[in-house]
Every structure is written in C-alpha cells, then in structure tokens.
Amino acid sequence: MTSARRGRASVRLLASRIARFARERTVLLVSALAALATVAFVPPDEAYLGYFDVKTLACLFGILAVVGALRGIGLFEHAARLIVARFATCRSAVAALVGSTLVLSMFATNDLALIMMLPLSAATLLKAGWERSLPFAFIMQNLAANLGGMILPFGNPQNLYLYERFSIPLGDFLSVMTLPFAVSVALIALCCALFAKPEPPQPAKKRAAEKEMTKKRATKKRATEKRAAEKQSAEERTTDNSLADEGRQQAAFPASGEPLQRTNVSCETFGPFAVSSGSPRQTARNGEGPTSAFEQGRGADTAAPRIVSARRARALGYAALLVLVIASVFRVVPYPVAVGAVVVALGVLDRRALRTVDWELLLTFACFFVFAGNLARIPAVEGFFSFWMGESALLVAAGASQIISNVPAAVLLSHFADGYQALLVGVNIGGAGTLVASLASLITFNEYRLVRRGFPSRPALARVTPGAYLARFTAYNAAFLVVLLLVCAPFV
C-alpha cells in the first residue's frame, strides 16, 4: 500500500513538473510542435541546413549576452532611475518611464527593455500612490517597446533577421522605417499627454490635508480653552495666577499644531524595490528619511544599483563589446570575430551573463526557421502566400502577425516577398494588436498579473482585473495598428 502511494505521489510530482515546464516555455514548445508538424510534409534532407540564418542567431546571441552583462551591473536600471527622478507628477513620471522603455528597446530589444523597465515602473507608481495609472503605463510601455525598436536593425529580432536576409543597406532601412517610427512616437506621446493624470504624489496630498485638519483642530481647541480660562478667571480670582500660567503654556504651543510624534511609513515589497506608502520626494522634504536613489540618482536607498568606480571599467568594456557586435550587424566587422570576442571576454569577466542569455529565444528562432522553410516548400502554401503577398504585402504581414506573432511571420513571409519594404513595415507595426502579435506583450501581461496579485490592498489595481486590462490593452493596440496602417499604406 505504501509503495502504491509513493508511486502515485511520484506520478503527480512528475505531472506537476511537466505542467510547470510547459507553462514556463509555452512559446518554445508551440514553435517546436509546429516545426515537427511540417516535417510530416517535408521529410528532413540536405535543404534543412539552408533554413538557418547563422549570422542572425550569432548576432542575436552576442547582443543578448552583452546586454545581460550590462544589466547585471545595473547600468540600465541606474540610468532609468536618474531619468525618472527628475519628474514629480504622474504624467511626467509615466512619460519618463515610457520614453526610457522606448529608447532602451532600440538597443536592448523589446523583451529585455520590458523585463528591465516594468518592475521599475511598478515600484515608482506604487510608491507615489499612482497605482491607478499603472495599467495605462504598462500598456504604453508595451507599445513603446514593440514599436520603438523598429527604427534600428538590431532593435528587435525580426528586424535583425530581415536586415540580414535581404542585405538591406542601413540608409535604406532608416528611410523605410522613419515614417512608422515617427508616427508611433507621436501617438505614444499624445496618449501620455491626454490620459496620464498630472497629479502630485497621492501620499503627499493626503499628508497635506491631514496637516491642515490638525491645524484647524488645534486652533479650535486653543480658542475653547481660552474662553474657558477667561470664564474661570472672572468667577474664581483665587486661581487667576494658575490660569494665567496655563494660558501662557497654551500660547507657547506651536502655531502649526503639528503632532510631535513621527508617522511610521509602511512599506510593501515588489521584486527588488521597496515600495513605501509615501512619496520619496515628499518624504525627504518632511525629514522622514533619505531621498531614494531613483529620486536623486544617489542617496541611501540600498535597493538602487549604482555603478561604483570599481565597475566603471567593466561597464566601459561591455559597452565596447556591444559596439563590436553592432558593427558586425552593420557588416563592418566579421560576425565570428565579434561573437568570439564576446564569448572570451564574458567567459573571463562575467560568466553569469552567458548563463542569462535567453537560450529559449534562440531555440525558438531555430524552430521558426524549420517551420517557415518547410512551409515554403509545400506547393499549396507557397501558392497561397505568393498570391496574397503580391496583392498586399503590408496587410498580409500585419495580419499574420496578429495570429502567429511578428517574428515567425517575418521568417515565414520572407520566402514569398519580392521586396522587403512592405514586409519590414508590416511585421513591425503588426506588433501592435492582439496579445500574441508580439511575444513581448506576454511579458507585460504576466507582469501586470504579478503586480496585481502582490498588492491586493490597492483598490485601484483590484478594480482592473486581468480581463479588464486585456480589454484596455486590445483597444489601445488596435487603435495604434489602424492608424499606422492608414498612414503607412500609401508609402510602401
């Protein structure tokens, strides 16, 4: 009986581990199954070796490794905190967070930009009492990450792939992507200006109201005591001196009526950030504690990573490696030299950065290559996509991105495109739309669920359920997609 129970427990444990593995690596498993399904139609042969774009995979590995090293020493987070520290209203803070995400996505890819910036946004907005704007900030950051990286070849994986596949000159790439990028930035800025509230930190407003109420109560109390003292003085002259002394003591009480005891600041924890119930700027002004590091860029907040002098040389070295990899993307340096330098340097300086590389993304890309290569060799599929890509490559690319995501759409449709312009624009603006249009959007959705579950006491977050967040997300993304399609269609 005991052995039977142990057997059942082992089976349940194994099933639980398999289910967790599937949940954590859903995208990789789906792409692997899709690739295996196409093998039934196109058996493996020598042509499979031609599916893989080795340079794309190598350059993507180099960028991920160097960005992981820079993130490990806190460079991106430190820079973002310095930017956010200069803004004191909800609107300006949201704009700074979204703008930082957009700029970061140009150099660190969209998914890494979101991984680094979303926790910082949650900590900043929750600390200042702006949790009502958190869903909006997450949606705008998601759009900024997906659309901001389109301007550079290494801003997102599909750009890197198409840049290499079609051997696009850098000048031509920039000229094609300038219009959709400019429209995207303008739309994001407009939304931040219209829908982000220009309110000061909520805890500061509450403390100001409480302080004013305390003053009024103290003034009323002193007036009542004064009248009582005058009445007693008229009736009992024998106690006049004691009453006068008491009156002088009352008059000596501070006019502001502020309570003498300090108010404890409650704290909540989210990820690596401590989230207090007070505004960091207001807390410093009131003498309740030191200004936090993301408020001044320096100070006593030990949670804020700082680039100390001992790490500056390493940061410069990593920056040089990043420049080397980017030079290989632009075909200035042979990519084996750049990637080899990254492996050797990080193997000596920071092996953890090599372990933090998103190997799942690289394997997913390899599966996409097999899936797309096999589909291109199926006559019916080839005829279908060849016809529709000739009719409207922009709409096909954007539409396919809504269903299978923009990275596999770029890999698949590149086999049927006569030119790169419409395909390049379509898969980039196609990152807006459904939740699966860009795999980075899943990062944002999961992060929002995590934040909401971690702060159940915040009513503004409790009201916006994951379903309500998804509805808002879809509405904003659909509006962006429609506008971008209408603007870009006449020019590609």
What are these regions (language model features)?
Residues 54-56, 84-98, 127-137, 380-396, ...:
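Membrane-interfacial loop-to-helix junctions in multi-pass transporters
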Residues 97, 103-150, 161, 411-424, ...:
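Hydrophobic transmembrane alpha-helices that form the pore/transport pathway of multi-pass ion
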Residues 135, 171-211, 243, 297-307, ...:
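Juxtamembrane and boundary regions of transmembrane helices in multi-pass small-molecule transporters
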Residues 207-239:
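Long, intrinsically disordered low-complexity tandem-repeat segments
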Residues 2, 8, 186-211, 215, ...:
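Long, contiguous bundles of hydrophobic transmembrane helices that form the permeation core
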Residues 19-23, 46-56, 170-180, 309-310, ...:
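Interfacial loop-to-helix junctions that mark the boundaries of transmembrane helices
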Residues 51, 73, 77-80, 321-418:
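Transmembrane helical segments that form the transport core of multi-pass membrane transport proteins
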Residues 20-41, 53-65, 119, 314-324, ...:
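Hydrophobic mid-bilayer segments of alpha-helices in multi-pass membrane transport proteins
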